[in-house]
Amino acid sequence: FKDRKPEIPSAFHVQCDSFMFHKERMCRVLETKVPSKYKKLLFIDGDVIFSNDSWYSDISKLLDSHDVVQPFETCEWLDLTYTNVTLTRKSVLFMKESIWNYNYHPGFGWAFRREWYNKVGFFDWAISGSGDTLSSASWLKKSFPKIFKSLPTSLKPAYSEFAAKPVPRITYYEKSKIQHLYHGSKTNRQYVERHKIIDNELDIRKLITINKDGMYEWINKDKWNPLFLEYFQSRADDDLSDLPYRGPTS
């Protein structure tokens, strides 16, 4: 960001001067840097631990016959001592309802056949977060309840186009568990409230441009950067409080 020096000098770097959720767009940019000989991709959060040491090869085998794999069956959130489980949820693939149900988890990581990722992949416009929710709901052809705040109005035109794309052959990594390492209260992340920032009648695609590194930038930084900076500062990701939480997790 701006003139800040990278924390990992040997990593691949991009520059951006806009505050927003960049994950899905960064995945697109990163894919272009992966040598073409690799036909499978895995995007995984850096704060999770697998229970099975063979996860890498097992997920690779699943991608021989599937386009998309969620790399776990069960996920657990650990408390700040890393010893107690505060929340447990199943993979979103266990959702039987046709209407989206927050009691299953859509995040932490997704593996893809590279060909399918390039055809469809993630929903790239979730710049207020919930990209995993919106992406997996489309892949699984789930509809949303009448009161659903994770799809702000400005995203709806782009999401309608995304939802019309091909459905993947999708599965989960059976009998595998991952644990999420604690880093601040989930309550502070405002999984619902954050979407109000862009809940307006403007098409998100008309508010954003792509910079020289392939990253999204606000066209009007003076308007949108202060709003998103205030949100990110309020998250307190390193906070040591551990408040009970049972709401959305992505």
PLM region spans:
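Active-site-proximal specificity loops/subdomain of glycosyltransferases
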Residues: F1-Y38
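Residues at the C-termini of beta-strands that transition into short coil/loop
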Residues: Q15-S18, S54, F72-E73, K175, ...
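Short, solvent-exposed loop/turn segments at secondary-structure junctions
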Residues: D47-I49, T74-W77, Y117, I178-Q179, ...
